[in-house]
Amino acid sequence: MASRLAKSAICAARVRPVLSSRTIPAAATTLTSTRSVSNVPTEDPKTKAQSIIDALPGNSLVSKTAILSAGAGLSIAAISNELYVFSEETVAAFCLLSVFAGVAKMAGPMYKEWAETQIQKQKDILNGARANHTNAVKQRIENVKQLSGVVDITKALFEVSKETARLEAQAYELEQRTALAAEAKKVLDSWVQYEGQVKVRQQRELAQTVISKVQKELENPKVIQQILQQSVTDVERIFAAKPQ
């Protein structure tokens, strides 16, 4: 593996063009003019380094440095012990990972914005539902508050119903008493009428008896003679009692 790396380095050195000391100032001048003309802002190396450090796992700078050192040591050990062969697949994998990292870096803010929009939309829906539920509960509470006097009203109505029932009972009792009094009066009237009829019949019978008895006695001559004598005696006494 080491011989292969050495051969590739030698070939690269042979293929690489050699720059003369004359061409270096010209290239530097061209690069300087190009940088002065360009208005594209360059990224601060400190910021870039800080972003790389922040991307590493760990909570402190010491842990991140330890992780980076351990990764580098493991990579060197794997390559030196030929546990990992640096080949075209490694270059392809590195390029692919670079492409993925670039896509993630470019599409990350858009995805983040879209995700935040969706999250905000869901939050708005949930907040709206909660507000509607709160308003419904408040409205229900207000409706129930309007019925807070139902107990007192029910008690008053119950008292009124009891009083009404009592008055109805009294009215029914008075009606029954009135009906009973009317029936008793009717019975008494019929009894008085019956007694009057009985008295009239008795008087009629008594008168008939007396008349028949008198008529029977008048048929006797002795009785007639006694009556005449008594009448004459009475007349004489009356005339005798008159003053002369």
Swiss-Prot record:
Keywords: CF(0), Hydrogen ion transport, Ion transport, Membrane, Mitochondrion, Mitochondrion inner membrane, Transit peptide, Transport. GO terms for molecular function: proton-transporting ATP synthase activity, rotational mechanism. Residues 1-36 form a transit peptide. InterPro entries: ATP_synth_Bsub_B/MI25 (IPR008688), ATP_synth_F0_suB (IPR013837). Pfam families: Mt_ATP-synt_B. It is found in: Mitochondrion; Mitochondrion inner membrane. One of its GO terms (cellular component) is proton-transporting ATP synthase complex. This is ATP synthase subunit 4, mitochondrial. The gene is ATP4. The keyword Transit peptide applies. SUPFAM superfamilies: ATP synthase B chain-like (SSF161060). PANTHER family: ATP SYNTHASE F(0) COMPLEX SUBUNIT B1, MITOCHONDRIAL, MITOCHONDRIAL ATP SYNTHASE B CHAIN.
